[in-house]
């Protein structure tokens, strides 16, 4: 398949009764998804496959659904549980593609070219690149023309403890206890 979308995650508002949430991108296996529920207060909980939810349509180009488990009344339902795992009202459901960063395609010398597995391997690499880009898109970055010499902290973890990120008079990364005109302990 050609990879025609850069979507790697979907986000939804829950209402306490919805149990089905779509993911609009290809995954190869059910375990290729990470499902996180964020509470109204901001705490995040990563849910567990087959305990809190099940996945449909792994392997299809168009995606599928995450079905949170609850008491459907029919124990043969794939998403049946005696415990209600549906996200509560005002919670946010985030579904992320999260592939294992490995390459499992093996070519055997003198065998016919395995076009399907080769295409899947290329798709997997593209998906991994998209996941990395999605993470980079959520980071603080310097502009391409920035002349900062090092984006690394040279200060030890002990020296950074209880301080805030800052830029020094040269524009380099630094840590300080000063915030604006306030100077002192960050706990006060």
Q: What name fits each language-model region?
A:
Residues 1-122, 131, 135, 152-175, ...:
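N-terminal assembly/attachment segments of tailed bacteriophage virion structural proteins
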Residues 137-155, 185-188:
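Extracellular/surface-exposed low-complexity repeats and stalk/linker segments enriched in Gly/Pro
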């Amino acid at each position: 398949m050609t990879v025609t979308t850069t979507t790697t995650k979907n986000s939804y508002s829950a209402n306490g009764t919805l149990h089905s949430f779509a993911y609009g991108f290809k995954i190869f296996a059910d375990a290729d998804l990470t499902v996180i529920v964020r509470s109204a207060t901001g705490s995040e909980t990563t849910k567990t496959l087959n305990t809190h939810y099940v996945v449909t349509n792994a392997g299809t180009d168009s995606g599928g659904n995450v079905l949170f488990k609850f008491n459907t009344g029919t124990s043969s339902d794939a998403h049946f549980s005696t415990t209600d795992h549906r996200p509560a009202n005002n919670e946010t459901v985030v579904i992320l593609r999260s592939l294992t960063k490995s390459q499992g395609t093996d070519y055997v010398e003198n065998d016919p070219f395995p076009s399907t597995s080769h295409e899947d391997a290329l798709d997997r690499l593209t998906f991994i690149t998209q996941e990395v880009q999605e993470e980079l898109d959520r980071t603080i970055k310097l502009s391409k023309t920035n002349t900062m010499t090092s984006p690394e902290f040279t200060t030890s973890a002990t020296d950074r403890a209880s301080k805030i990120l800052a830029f020094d008079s040269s524009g380099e990364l630094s840590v300080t206890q000063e915030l604006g005109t306030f100077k002192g302990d960050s706990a006060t």
